[in-house]
């Protein structure tokens, strides 16, 4: 059992209030997931730089800043608790190579031109306060509260999962064919950091989006993803909700003017 939430703003006048609204939604889902929490915020930023969301819990900010500056040219580096948002023109292939060689204890939790992801073990109320979610602005956001069932309670095991540029996924449910699907995706070049079935679903969607649009990808998912689930998958343009055909996991969708 987990809690998933998402909000998309029609009016730019409300963008400064996005974090406050998403905070309330996450806290209200606390009883469905007390083990960990996380959220993804999409911002309407017109820049050519990539933004990399990194968890640096095993290294001090000053040490990381000094060492990473020797490896790549940084546009900006902003600290938020044990996460940082790194802005640079360097492409994901370069960043992944640098992290794998020089910073093996630093975790890349998401990247893109718009998305910022923060997630951590702990009570959702504490996670919201830790990252000061109330102060975030943006166009849309999704969040997750986790009750662990099939994998460890770790930051890497927390949602959202991001396996593609400006893409992320949160999930309530369980997949029964994630091990077979994981093996197929690894053969196609996907890399996974946890044993969580949700990360496999995120990898499936990212892999499928190479050849299909989001709507067709999700339709294919109904055939390829076996289990009971409700997903929210986020992109730079918005997000979509997918439920299995039996639909035993609840989802409430509302729209206002």
Name the predicted role of every residue range:
Residues 1-257:
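Conserved short alpha-helical segments that host acidic/polar catalytic motifs at enzyme active sites
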């Amino acid at each position: 059992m987990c809690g998933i939430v998402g909000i998309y703003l029609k009016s730019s006048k409300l963008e400064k209030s996005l974090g406050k609204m998403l905070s309330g939604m996450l806290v209200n889902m606390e009883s469905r997931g007390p083990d960990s929490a996380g959220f993804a915020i999409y911002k309407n930023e017109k820049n050519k730089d990539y933004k990399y969301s990194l968890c640096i819990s095993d290294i001090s900010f000053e040490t990381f800043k000094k060492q990473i500056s020797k490896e790549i040219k940084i546009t900006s580096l902003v600290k938020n608790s044990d996460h940082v948002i790194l802005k640079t023109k360097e492409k994901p292939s370069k960043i992944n190579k640098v992290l794998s060689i020089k910073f093996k204890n630093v975790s890349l939790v998401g990247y893109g031109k718009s998305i910022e992801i923060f997630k951590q073990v702990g009570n959702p109320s504490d996670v919201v306060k830790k990252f000061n979610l109330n102060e975030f602005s943006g166009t849309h956001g999704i969040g997750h509260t986790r009750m662990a069932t099939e994998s460890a309670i770790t930051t890497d095991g927390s949602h959202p999962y991001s396996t593609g540029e400006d893409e992320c996924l949160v999930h309530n449910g369980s997949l029964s064919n994630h091990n077979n699907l994981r093996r197929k995706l690894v053969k196609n070049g996907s890399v996974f950091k946890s044993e969580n079935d949700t990360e496999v679903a995120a990898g499936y969607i990212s892999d499928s989006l190479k050849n299909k649009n989001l709507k067709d990808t999700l339709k294919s998912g109904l055939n390829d993803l076996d289990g009971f689930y409700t997903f929210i998958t986020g992109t730079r343009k918005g997000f979509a909700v997918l439920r299995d055909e039996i639909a035993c996991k609840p989802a409430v969708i509302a729209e206002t003017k």
